[in-house]
Amino acid sequence: MVKTQRVVITPGEPAGIGPDLVVQLAQREWPVELVVCADTTLLTDRAAMLGLPLTLRPYSPNSPAQPQTTGTLTLLPVALRESVTAGQLAIENGHYVVETLARACDGCLNGEFAALITGPVHKGVINDAGIPFTGHTEFFEERSQAKKVVMMLATEELRVALATTHLPLRDIADAITPALLHEVIAILHHDLRTKFGIAEPRILVCGLNPHAGEGGHMGTEEIDTIIPVLDELRAQGMKLNGPLPADTLFQPKYLDNADAVLAMYHDQGLPVLKYQGFGRGVNITLGLPFIRTSVDHGTALELAGRGEADVGSFITALNLAIKMIVNTQ
């Protein structure tokens, strides 16, 4: 890296394992400054519960960023709405969680931070607090006024992007339009080049239907929509292979010659990735005007404050964000 960068971290649901994981992140050195957007007492109390050392340094945006030293974090304070008991949700803290996301997002947009790494949130408690919330991806898309974003999950061996995200199965076929596919593939291709440093991305594209439609006998979306779009984009120079049946695509003879897979819907691509690398996966939002990565697991309320949470996914998310920062410099 040319100079030390700042990355901002949101721990997520305060009653879950997010604060535990952030405290665990602090137990090693990092080449970037870790700015945690969270409540002061929440972090110090959780560190005490875990028996881990933690010194919180005030965020000073006008000072040069410094690499993070062991046992320290830089704190950008946001106050809890209610006091927290590990493992017990408090509805009012749904507002607190959204405040941390908004502050972190705005900091990325105004250039304070080079990347954003998010911990797990509890969507139910945020909605119970009266805040419509589908997920991080949609929240950052709206707040950043991005034209379109794409969800991609990745392990060291596999990257899977989604054409659609949190839609009921009955709505997916109607959502797969030529315009959507053009946009999603363009974003995926662009970010693989600019954020992952892949000069000529090779993308495998799943069909929508079983056997990729079996020549139109099991659905016509491949013939009517997917194939024409892929043909157009191939003519522009993109390296696209598909549409391929999803039940046979995820094997070495295809994956060894690909940089990413585009699945048509959430449960088509992600079960394979999570089986292959659960606990090591990272959620990446493509198409944003900043770098955003996230853990690939939930809040695990039952583990909060017990010292049993696995920090592996958070470490992977942070390391990937650092690599993406380097690629974009």
Swiss-Prot record:
Q: Which GO terms describe its cellular component?
A: cytoplasm
As recorded in UniProt, its EC number(s) are: 1.1.1.262
Residues where substrate binds: H136, T137, K274, N283, R292
Q: Which reaction does it catalyse?
A: 4-(phosphooxy)-L-threonine + NAD(+) = 3-amino-2-oxopropyl phosphate + CO2 + NADH
Compartments annotated for it: namely: Cytoplasm
**Pathway membership, UniProt:** Cofactor biosynthesis; pyridoxine 5'-phosphate biosynthesis; pyridoxine 5'-phosphate from D-erythrose 4-phosphate: step 4/5
Q: Name one GO molecular function term.
A: cobalt ion binding
What does the cofactor field's note say? Binds 1 divalent metal cation per subunit. Can use ions such as Zn(2+), Mg(2+) or Co(2+).
Q: Name one Pfam family in it.
A: PdxA
Purpose: Catalyzes the NAD(P)-dependent oxidation of 4-(phosphooxy)-L-threonine (HTP) into 2-amino-3-oxo-4-(phosphooxy)butyric acid which spontaneously decarboxylates to form 3-amino-2-oxopropyl phosphate (AHAP).
Q: What is this protein called?
A: 4-hydroxythreonine-4-phosphate dehydrogenase
Q: Which gene encodes it?
A: pdxA
